[in-house]
Amino acid sequence: MAVYTEVPDEELEAFLATYDIGTLMSYKGIAEGVENSNFMLHTDAGTYFLTLYEKRVAESELPFFLGLMNHLVDRGISCPTPIRNRKGEMLGRLAERPAAIVSFLEGISVRRPQPRHCVELGRALAQLHMAGADFKLARKNALNVDGWGPLFDSCRDGIDAYQPGLAQELDKELAVLTREWPRDLPHGVIHADLFPDNVFFIGDRLSGLIDFYFACNDAFAYDLAICLNAWCFEADGSFNITKARALLQAYTQVRPLEPAEIHALPLLARGSAMRFLLTRLYDLINHPPGAFVKPKDPKEYLTRLRFHRGVASPAGYGLDA
């Protein structure tokens, strides 16, 4: 979450007057993340989050994101609840941008996840996948395997400038992924961005999931692969199979994986690593000088991609095929 748009006090007060959330006492911008402008609001009725959606989030897709959060809350998933204004609308406008207010979620993210955190994550991810089964709206994954080639082509020259020879390596990897990608796995609504900073804990217990603005319809096992990459590597680049086993076993206790999903896991993990490697490369190559948010380092996802390329079977993640 980041602050890109400053909001004049009088505009904010007029906007909040259309909601029944009490009188504003104080607010502050939140300088994290890369997508939207976010503010924490303190009113005499409680604490809330205000989000102004910047240009990377299409306004036409906001009903999906907000509707999904509302649906998941109704199904017992702990995530921010969109607050409706007095007209019953979840989406408004502020500072010439689409804007929404959501409930405040208690908890903090963990910087160094342990196996016990991965157990909590696996269980919550499976519950999310099952809870989204009857959600009526759908959103295509714009960053699926079919989108990686165009993304790569758009920054190929910059990739070789970043690391000579890397473009050729990624070109070959993309050919393999495109040819072998499984397209008939069980699918539905996935989070698609469940990094540790998007998962809150109180003590060792998971207290909620946030940041659903990459959520889409895709394979459930691909969402698992994203979590393998985001949660199961150490700072030195090594893979922690204990964390992976904890994550996967906890998931399967809630939603058992089909044999095809288990078999596809190494390829899905490669694809997940490729997706985040490419977006990080793109953001680094196209990073404006003096921009507020520092781009994330692509190298860690290159290391992860190369690791998964060497995984011969699901046993490499602690699963039996």
Swiss-Prot record:
Q: What is its EC number?
A: 2.7.1.39
Q: Which CDD domains match?
A: HomoserineK_II
UniProt pathway annotation: Amino-acid biosynthesis; L-threonine biosynthesis; L-threonine from L-aspartate: step 4/5
**Keyword annotations of the record:** Amino-acid biosynthesis, ATP-binding, Kinase, Nucleotide-binding, Threonine biosynthesis, Transferase
Q: Cite the SUPFAM superfamilies for this sequence.
A: Protein kinase-like (PK-like) (SSF56112)
Gene3D superfamilies registered for this protein in UniProt = 3.90.1200.10, Phosphorylase Kinase, domain 1
Per UniProt, the enzyme's principal EC class comes to transferase
Q: Does the keyword Disulfide bond apply?
A: no
Q: What Pfam family is a match, any one?
A: APH
Give the InterPro entries listed for this entry.
Aminoglycoside_PTrfase (IPR002575), Homoserine_kinase_II (IPR005280), Kinase-like_dom_sf (IPR011009), Pseudomonas-type_ThrB (IPR050249)
Q: Which GO terms describe its molecular function?
A: ATP binding; homoserine kinase activity
- Reaction(s) the record says it catalyses: L-homoserine + ATP = O-phospho-L-homoserine + ADP + H(+)
Q: Which family does it belong to?
A: Belongs to the pseudomonas-type ThrB family.
Q: What name does the UniProt record give this protein?
A: Homoserine kinase
- Name the source organism: Parvibaculum lavamentivorans (strain DS-1 / DSM 13023 / NCIMB 13966)
